[in-house]
């Protein structure tokens, strides 16, 4: 039987919202086959998110957040399946938390798949050159690059970022949790972040740090 890897467990958890131990057990039961593992979890009633993947989430809200005298602004579209859920305080607070995350952590993309291939290759080339300059053997450089590129994803992709209020969870973890708790499919559809004077040479001001302070009040 093929050994189940941590990466497989993580992927299954992201796709189903099931617990880590349940995901590991499912993969072991089916010899590491991802599709069969999803079916296994669904049969056991443990795949909260997988059941809702095919459902349409066309309701929701557009959350607008403006920080510190108009110096940072965020617009976020958060979708759910019904207007009833969209109007609940819990859903609105979740949208607020995600908007604050965007203001503080400066993601440029929603998911890994949204990063342009040219930018990804450029980043990999830089990381490869860094590893070689550090004197690392060429045969292990590519593995090192793959490891380090995950840090890049965490910096630029919202769903991969650690939640500022609880660094033990990623934003994707939060979406899965909220989906399981509410019982509806929850989707971060899109977002835009503005920072006053962005792209203009100016005195350094860490507006993002100010947002983080506000989140932790």
Curated annotation (Swiss-Prot):
Region feature Involved in Mg(2+) ion dislocation from EF-Tu, mapped onto this chain: 82-85
Signal peptide (from-to): none
Keyword Protein biosynthesis: yes
GO cellular component, one term: cytoplasm
UniProt keyword annotation of Cytoplasm present: yes
Main location: cytoplasm
Database matches in PROSITE patterns: EF_TS_1 (PS01126), EF_TS_2 (PS01127)
Keyword tags: Cytoplasm, Elongation factor, Protein biosynthesis
Superkingdom classification of source: Bacteria
GO molecular function terms attached to this record: translation elongation factor activity
Subcellular localization, as worded in the UniProt entry: Cytoplasm
NCBIfam families: tsf
Function: Associates with the EF-Tu.GDP complex and induces the exchange of GDP to GTP. It remains bound to the aminoacyl-tRNA.EF-Tu.GTP complex up to the GTP hydrolysis stage on the ribosome.
Family: Belongs to the EF-Ts family.
Protein name stated in the entry: Elongation factor Ts
Gene name in the database record: tsf
């Amino acid at each position: 039987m093929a050994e189940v890897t941590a990466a497989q467990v993580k992927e299954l958890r992201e796709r189903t919202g099931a617990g880590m131990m349940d995901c590991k057990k499912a993969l072991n039961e089916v010899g590491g086959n991802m599709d069969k593992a999803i079916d296994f979890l669904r049969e056991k009633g443990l795949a909260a998110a997988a059941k809702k993947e095919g459902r349409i989430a066309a309701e929701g809200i557009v959350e607008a957040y403006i920080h510190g005298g108009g110096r940072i602004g965020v617009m976020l579209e958060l979708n759910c399946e019904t207007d009833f859920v969209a109007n609940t305080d819990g859903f609105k607070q979740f949208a607020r938390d995600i908007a604050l995350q965007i203001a503080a952590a400066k993601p440029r993309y929603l998911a890994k798949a949204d990063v342009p291939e040219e930018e990804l290759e450029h980043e990999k080339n830089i990381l490869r050159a860094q590893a070689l300059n550090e004197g690392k053997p060429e045969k292990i450089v590519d593995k090192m690059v793959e490891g380090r590129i995950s840090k890049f994803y965490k910096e630029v992709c919202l769903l991969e970022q650690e939640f500022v209020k609880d660094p033990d969870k990623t934003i994707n973890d939060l979406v899965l949790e909220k989906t399981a708790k509410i019982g509806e499919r929850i989707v971060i559809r899109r977002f835009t972040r503005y920072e006053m004077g962005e792209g203009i040479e100016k005195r350094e001001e860490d507006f993002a740090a100010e947002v983080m302070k506000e989140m932790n009040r």
